[in-house]
């Protein structure tokens, strides 16, 4: 039977499948046509995300049904060197006790007029 897969760009892909095909098989066919790895694909039908081990028949997907293809977003880990740089930039500061202005680490007086250029400074608290 023939089904359609619609991408977020509006492109429609036509696939030749059987109702006994698994979602894994469908994703492999999409990879063959579009080059998108199966682990980045999410297929939606009738508002539900289709699970890899199930078949098209399990979801009552019939001929000429339309599935929606969404790409999975992946997060990443920040490298330790970038983490140290971010920590230095965000945490190595002095804070004015009167107006809460963030100041450079070697500050002696606040730079703001509203607290009278106070010399009551404290280091910024460290995040655990």
From Swiss-Prot:
User: Any keyword Cytoplasm?
Assistant: yes
The entry's protein name is Ubiquitin-ribosomal protein eL40 fusion protein
A Pfam family of this chain = ubiquitin
Molecular function (GO) terms listed? mRNA binding; structural constituent of ribosome
Q: Which domain of life is it from?
A: Eukaryota
Q: Tell me where in this chain the Ubiquitin-like domain is found.
A: 1-76
> Which SMART domains does the UniProt record give?
Ribosomal_L40e, UBQ
Indicate yes or no for the key word Ribonucleoprotein: yes
* Protein source organism: Nicotiana sylvestris (Wood tobacco)
Task: List the keywords (alphabetical).
Answer: Cytoplasm, Isopeptide bond, Nucleus, Ribonucleoprotein, Ribosomal protein, Ubl conjugation
Q: What family is it from?
A: In the N-terminal section; belongs to the ubiquitin family.
Q: What is the lineage of its organism?
A: Eukaryota, Viridiplantae, Streptophyta, Embryophyta, Tracheophyta
UniProt miscellaneous comment: Ubiquitin is generally synthesized as a polyubiquitin precursor with tandem head to tail repeats. Often, there are one to three additional amino acids after the last repeat, removed in the mature protein. Alternatively, ubiquitin extension protein is synthesized as a single copy of ubiquitin fused to a ribosomal protein (either eL40 or eS31) or to an ubiquitin-related protein (either RUB1 or RUB2). Following translation, extension protein is cleaved from ubiquitin.
The record's InterPro entries line, in alphabetical order, gives: Ribosomal_eL40_dom, Ribosomal_eL40_sf, Ribosomal_zn-bd, Ubiquitin-like_dom, Ubiquitin-like_domsf, Ubiquitin_CS, Ubiquitin_dom, Ubiquitin_ubiquitin-like
Q: Where is this cross-link: Glycyl lysine isopeptide (Gly-Lys) (interchain with K-? in acceptor proteins)?
A: 76
One GO biological process term: translation
Q: List, alphabetically, the PANTHER family matched.
A: UBIQUITIN
Q: Name one GO cellular component term.
A: ribosome
Q: Where is this cross-link: Glycyl lysine isopeptide (Lys-Gly) (interchain with G-Cter in ubiquitin)?
A: 48
